[in-house]
UniProtKB/Swiss-Prot annotation:
Keywords: Nucleus, Repeat, Ribosome biogenesis, rRNA processing, WD repeat. SUPFAM superfamilies: WD40 repeat-like. This is Ribosome biogenesis protein YTM1. It is found in: Nucleus, Nucleolus; Nucleus, Nucleoplasm. Pfam families: NLE, WD40. GO terms for cellular component: nucleoplasm; PeBoW complex; preribosome, large subunit precursor.
Amino acid sequence: MSSTGENKNQIKIKFFTNEEDESLQVADTPLYVPVTLKRFGLSEVVNHLLGNFKGEDETKAPIPFDFLIDGVLLRTSIEDYLTKNGLSNEAFLTLEYTRAILPPSFLASFNNDDWISSIDSINPTTKIVMSSQLSISQPKILSGSYDGIVRTYNMSGKVEKQYVGHSAPVKAVKWISPTRIVSAGNDRQVRLWKTSYEEIIDEDEEEIEDGKTLALLEGHKAPVVDLAVDTQTNRILSAGYDQNIGFWSTNYKEMTSIQPLEYDSNVVSSSSKKRRKMAVQDATIRRRAPLSLLQGHSEPVEGVIFDAKDSTVGYSVSQDHTIKTWDLVTSRCVDTRTTGYSLLSVLQLPQVNLIASGSSARHINLHDPRVTTTSDQTISKLVGHTNFVVGLTASPHNQNMFASSSHDGTVKVWDVRAEKSLYTITRQDGSTNAKIFDVCWDDRIGIISGGEDKKLQINKGSDIAK
């Protein structure tokens, strides 16, 4: 006779998954579960249906799952979800389940000589490695620093190569191939670098190899703070505080040669021996002009990216509160979206058709670039950081996920299907005093972050985002 009372506390649901692994599929038969269940309880139900139990057989060990209702991650009990959405427990819910994102735990920390402004990485299966026809045996980390030096690290934390040439803080670094990189900095320079190809590094070799400057790419009249590389077209975008975007080739032979006209004025004014020495050294280096300069922003440009699906399209964000879409064939701006705050970083999530932009207002905007510009252009805002959001990086495993770095001293992991961040990463000692200037998510290495504490920190979850 108590079944009516029990039914009040239960709800009819059906499970489904888009996981490709057939062993994770359950029957779509409806069943009743308590409305008080949250993610953990629902995960137990699915594991029971899959026949997964704790025991000696690791192949049948329980798997942590996340759950979505109408494409939104469930972060409360079913009962709270019903209340929030004005539904009764007579509703019939369809729940999607997917492998859960496990917390990214601290893995390692590598020391650097100065603040770290920019990070990039490659591993044996990275797109730029596969397309270069050069193989590498181990992942590598690239860092740009406020001491003006670009460095590559191996996974033991050893600096393998360094690139000395910038006369002011380096603000952006990117891999072009295993033997080519590009960097940019406050000295207004974009530099193409070359290093010898060494598949096997001698771990006992104490001498750090110096990279060689292939060419100086000149055209900006103020600090250059961000770079994007498209390996399919061999093109580079640069974001300048002169309000311009540089469009370059990764091959210096494709750009017009220029003379070192008034070169001394192009070096940050200083009487330091280091900068005068650099200027003398650079006097013999080939210089190239940009293929074009994209003009349209009215304040410093903070971030640039290529469209992942169409290399002739680029996006930029600026302190002028706008995100612009560019036709790189004609060098024309084809779309401008205006916000109410300075935009400091930009990222594309191509599979879900979203552009994310980090702001000075501490939140992250998400918008669909395919949607015609309207007064309400933002699809959603992700709130959680307490200071500027200056770095964004996509998950290499999950099309809905990305990470952000902030001046609040943290890195946050996000899923666009959830209203709040999934996890917050602090420094190893738990502190949040030092600003985090950049973050890079590598599918082999993990989440790499760096900033004022002069450390490259690596965090990784065993099944994060898989």
